[in-house]
Design a protein with these regions (language model features):
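Short beta-strand segments at enzyme active-site cores
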Residues: 23-29, 89
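Gly-rich Lys/Arg/Thr-decorated short loops/hinges at beta-loop-alpha junctions or inter-strand turns
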Residues: 3-4, 27-32, 58
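Single conserved hydrophobic/aromatic residue that forms the stacking wall/gate
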Residues: 1-10
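Glycine-rich, proline-tolerant flexible connector loops at the mouths of alpha/beta enzymes
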Residues: 27-43
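Phosphate/diphosphate-binding loops
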Residues: 50-181
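Active-site loops and adjacent core secondary-structure elements that bind or stabilize anionic groups
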Residues: 8-9, 141-247
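Active-site-adjacent structural elements in folded domains
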Residues: 11-13, 32-36, 48, 64
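Structured alpha-helical segments in the cores of large, soluble enzyme domains
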Residues: 11-25, 42-55, 125-128
């Protein structure tokens, strides 16, 4: 089956469940295997939320998400923003448990670690919502108060109607290709240590950062020493970078 057919199957099953009187839907990406590939949770939630709204059934059911994709406040905000009622970040909890078993959290119990994680996520969500003048999660849920970058307008119209999409991008076929590639690398690799990735901090083989450590060091050195020649090295390094930002 194509990814679009699977998305339609999920929508149809959700409608049937609601019409049969179910009040809780649970979407989970657990149970992956070599033969079982995940679907992006954001697309699943958006598809079901939009479809149930069209059928005038959304108010009768809660959409509960159990996903390994939910790790930081951005992922929580987007999942809730497209319609998720609750989010269970099981992979984040598993990661906390692993680190707690290694005694990396000092005197804190595992329950304390989970509580502190939840508190930080809630604080991050409140900060995101407050920038829009929203203080209640129910007012933020399903509002799609963001815009997409790199998704085709067909996907945006089908799964996230009303979301601003100034720049188009890949469609379902492209997304599926990426998922298959990542899934293949994960299940065929013999490595037991995950690559760091460099999302939050610059890594040599990780994600590209405009403000790399070397350049930041040059900027700080130029300020502390009041050296224009060092600043020129910093400026040259910035100009030599390949285009990174869209603007």
């Amino acid at each position: 089956n194509t990814r679009r057919q699977r998305q339609m199957c999920i929508r149809d099953r959700s409608e049937i469940a609601v019409r049969q009187g179910q009040t809780q839907l649970i979407l989970t990406d657990k149970g992956l295997s070599f033969e079982r590939l995940p679907m992006p949770m954001l697309l699943c939630v958006g598809a079901i939320n939009t479809y149930l709204i069209e059928k005038k059934l959304r108010g009768y059911v809660s959409i509960n998400v159990q996903s390994g994709e939910a790790l930081d406040t951005h992922s929580f905000a987007t999942l809730i923003g497209v319609g998720a009622t609750t989010v269970n970040p099981y992979l984040a909890f598993d990661s906390l448990h692993q680190r707690h078993e290694k005694k990396l959290f000092g005197q804190y119990s595992f329950d304390d670690c989970v509580a502190r994680y939840i508190k930080s996520v809630n604080a991050g969500l409140l900060k995101i919502m407050s920038k829009m003048g929203i203080s209640v999660l129910s007012s933020y849920r399903g509002g799609c108060n963001f815009e997409t970058v790199g998704l085709s307008r067909t996907i945006v119209n089908d799964y996230f109607p009303g979301v601003v999409s100034k720049i188009s991008g890949i469609g379902l076929t492209g997304i599926e290709k990426k998922i298959r590639q990542i899934h293949k690398e994960a299940f065929e690799s013999t490595d037991t240590v995950l690559p760091i990735g460099g999302i939050y901090r610059y890594r040599k083989n990780g994600e590209t950062h405009q403000y790399q450590g070397r350049l930041i060091h040059l900027l700080q050195s130029s300020v502390s020493s009041n050296s224009y020649s060092v600043y020129k090295k910093y400026a040259e390094g910035i100009y030599d970078l390949h285009p990174i930002n869209l603007r």
